Each structure stands twice: as C-alpha cells, then as structure tokens.
C-alpha cells in the first residue's frame, strides 16, 4: 500500500504502513483526518513521503504509482500525524490522479 520506512523494516513489519492504510480508510469513511496519538519509541517529528501503488504486474518490482505526497520538513507535531496527513493527501489530493475510492484501498501496495 504505502512506502513509509523507518530503519530496515519491510512494509509488512512497519506499523506506520498500517497507520497510513487506516488513516486513508478513516478519511474515506468520515471525511476527517485521524489524529493518532504519539507512542513511546516513535521517531521525532520529521518529513515523510507516502507512495500508493497499484499491484505489480508479473515481472515488475512495484506497480504503477497511484498517489504520492510528502513533506521534506515536518508540518505536524508528531511523525504519526505527519504520516496520516500525507497518506490521506496521497489518496485524495495528488493532482495527477483521481481521488482514491474506498474499494481501491485493499488493492494497493
């Protein structure tokens, strides 16, 4: 679904990937950006980029880009909020793509 990496974790191991996916689902259902609480062990506020990709075709490393938004410097008080906001923006505000629809979320990598 998204490429949000901290350290050397794979997307399946990274709790921030789940956060991004949940933030997108929440926004598509409610129209509101979730405000996730900071957690012990979180990195300090920082810029993040969230990339959404369609499923990869056989022989491809990754699928076609479906949305990508991010910041170089933090705009939010926590990295979790930065990820949530960037994930939602990638899903519905990337001017290169139509807004993501609820049925598409589970299909993204």
Regions found by a protein language model. Give the residues of each.
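Basic nucleic-acid-binding interfaces
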Residues: 2-109
